[in-house]
Structures are given as C-alpha cells and as structure tokens.
Amino acid sequence: MFLKVLMLKQDDPRKCSAAKLVKFGLAKPVTRTASRTLILNPFSKKILLKSDKKLVNSITGIDCSWNLVTSAFQKTFSGISRKLPPLLAGNPMNYSKLNKLSTVEALAAAVYIMGDSALTHILLKKFKWGHTFFELNKNLLEDYSKAKSESEILEICHEYGLEAI
C-alpha cells in the first residue's frame, strides 16, 4: 500500500512522525489529496475495514496537532474518508490515551487492518516507542483486521470494554 502524508506543519518538526516517515522514504508528502486515497479522518462516520483496501490505491494521513484537529478536519479532502477503530497511543506525548495517535501510529494501524502487517512493523521500527504501540494494540489490531463489518468492529469494542465510536 502506498502511503502519503499531508503535513499541516502545526507541530514541532523535530517530533513530527510524518516528517520522519518522509525522511526515510516510507511516505510521500503531498499538498492535496487524491480521489482514490483513503483519508484517515477521526471525524469520519465510517470505520476502516479490511475490505476498504479494494477501493483505494493509497492511504493518506493528515498530520496536524491534536490541539487543532477540529479546525484541520473542517476542510474537505478528496478521497475516501475513514476513521480507525479505538486504539491506544504508544507515543510518549499521548501514551495510553484512546485514539490520540501520532500519524505513524494511525498509518501503521490502517495498513495492519488492511492486511499488511509487514509494512506496519517497518513503519513502527523507525521509532523508539513503535513497539509499545504494537504491544498495546496487537490483539485489537488482529481482531479488527478480521472484522467484515462495522457491527463486528463494534462487537470487538464491546468485548474489550472500549467506548463506542
């Protein structure tokens, strides 16, 4: 799966996980989104499913500050918008906070759910805390990757005692 990042440059560039992915050639920086890309949008009404893979040729992470996330996503982006199911952050800024993922965590989760666990590990290896994100979420990610519908995702959330999304 081809990865892209739309960097809104709202964070400290030294701590920006999207910039690091670009630096290592793991994601391409873009200035606008394409129609056949999957947009990771925490405000989307639809949850990401493995079956979404056949609809797109890339995944785009919108890199923005969590403090400005509402205004960042008021803009409309071309592409297919999906939100991730609930996951715990493994990054030092938001450790164990539900759904407060860094861009790399969001992209890694999306590619795992869509069936590319090898790419997930490649992405996370670039960060000291990458393994922490995976350890916190490995069972969830595995279950989410097997879900065939949003109702199955909601069942999984209920089984793990996670708040409804």
For each predicted feature, which ranges?
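Active-site cofactor/cluster-binding pocket
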Residues: R14-S102, I113-L140
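Short hydrophobic beta-strand segments
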Residues: M1-D11, T37-L40
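Long, charged alpha-helical interface segments
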Residues: K138-I165
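Catalytic subdomain that performs nucleotidyl-dependent activation
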Residues: L107
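Acidic, serine/threonine-rich low-complexity regulatory regions at protein termini
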Residues: K9, R32-T33, L162
